[in-house]
Amino acid sequence: MTTTVLPELGFYTLPGQPDSSRDLIDEVRLGEQLGFGRVFVSERYNKKEAATLCGAVGAVTDHIAISTAATNHNTRHPIVTAGFARTMQSLTGGRFTLGLGRGIAPMQDAFGIGRITTAQMEDFADLMRRLFRGEVIIGHDGPAGSWPVLHLDATLDEYLPMGMVAFGPNTLELAGRCFDEVVLHTFFTDETTVRCVETVKAAAERAGRDPDSVKVWSCYATIGDHIAEEERLMKLVGRLGTYLQGYGHLLARTNGWDETVVDRFLADEVVSSVRGLDVVGTTEQLEHVATLIPDEWLAPAAVGSPAQCVAAVRNQLDLGCDGVIMHGATPAELAPIIAEYRATA
């Protein structure tokens, strides 16, 4: 029996830090069997290099759509990125979307990678579009960089779907102008989510585009009670704690949260001694961290029974999102929630 595809639902493969990159194979096969419409591939500089993971996803699936969410345009030469995207389109029969993001500024500073600007991403997106139309680009000198020649194939005339992981208003407006899908950040409040959707759609309309053609994905932590308590602690408290460590003030400003809470959080001895709470934090450490995070900050998530999770996911669609990424859990962990979603359609 063929499973009906749920195009409005997606998941991240290899959430958090996997024991092995090969875990992806069973995850995406099951995700496709369950009927997820799209799998999202994140990137970390260890066992989660995006091009490798995307190739593996494409090789072991038949119809699920695949998006990077996200890679950074300045960690590869533009021709390497364009070649990666074209190879993925060929491998998958056109199921691939190249998703970009700004990255994490402290990490970029530490590694000597330049910080990414809105102008750079807009310039880079235009370069990718031109390369996929078969253009020979001579002497480009723009915000994304300078190159003598950029060229893929003179016979190429394709449209490359592109996505954006967006946070602030400038990036959201850019996504509406130039991109095909937008992934919002985890732990956005309902008010923030509505504002982001409206910003994207309005920017698309001002650019003369059909607002419905730009798909906005809520990235929504979906952690059911059927998952062990220690794992739930890692996937919720550990994940939000890691975000607060990386860019807590930005997240607080975006949601209208009290930034002094972030200051106290970052000054805590346990928090300052553990980098990557969602990877290496112990249960004892995470229980302590939970006392530092207001309950309302953890509230924008799907938790509880499968029915409660489904209700929370559907609320994201009611807020105006075109799709929901059930974030932080594997397809196996999400299976009871998908079953409830189908049963109550």
Residue ranges and their predicted role:
Residues D19-L30, F84, A166-L174, S305-N315:
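Short, acidic/polar
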Residues E8-R22, T71-P78, L156-F167, T222-D225, ...:
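Active-site mouth loops of central-metabolism enzymes
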Residues A50-T71, T75, F124, L131, ...:
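Alpha-helix-loop-beta-strand connector modules within alpha/beta enzyme cores
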Residues T2, R115-L152, T193-V194, E198, ...:
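An alpha-helical appendage that flanks or caps ligand/catalytic pockets
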Residues K47-A56, F188-A204, A332-P336:
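Active-site-adjacent beta->alpha loops and helix N-cap segments on the catalytic face
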Residues G35, V57, M88, M128, ...:
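Conserved, mostly hydrophobic/aromatic
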Residues P7-T13, V39-V41, A65-A69, F96-L100, ...:
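Hydrophobic faces of well-ordered beta-strands that scaffold small-molecule active sites
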Residues M1-T68, L160:
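N-terminal beta1-alpha1-beta2 module of alpha/beta enzyme domains
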